[in-house]
Amino acid sequence: MKRYNIKFKYRDESSNGKWNEQECTIYADSKYAAEKECKKIYGLGIDCEYIIYEVTEII
């Protein structure tokens, strides 16, 4: 498994349209799997808009 750092922005009703930035670090087999796990952990796409703008492998 590799470790990935994922940076994303999200906004929802409680942010009054303002984008908030967040990061997460995930162990996964691929970038795709890391993004999927991050979305699951943070509930991205359920009741918010989001943009994942950077995924980097941590060496």
Question: Would you name each region that the model predicts?
Answer:
Residues 11-13, 37-41:
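Intrinsically disordered, low-complexity boundary segments flanking structured domains
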Residues 9-13, 29-31, 58:
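Generic structural motif
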Residues 1-21:
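Short aromatic-glycine-(Arg/Gly/Cys) micro-motifs in beta-strand/loop hairpins
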Residues 19-30:
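A short, exposed loop/beta-hairpin motif centered on an aromatic-Gly-Thr core
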Residues 40-59:
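Short, mixed-charge low-complexity intrinsically disordered segments
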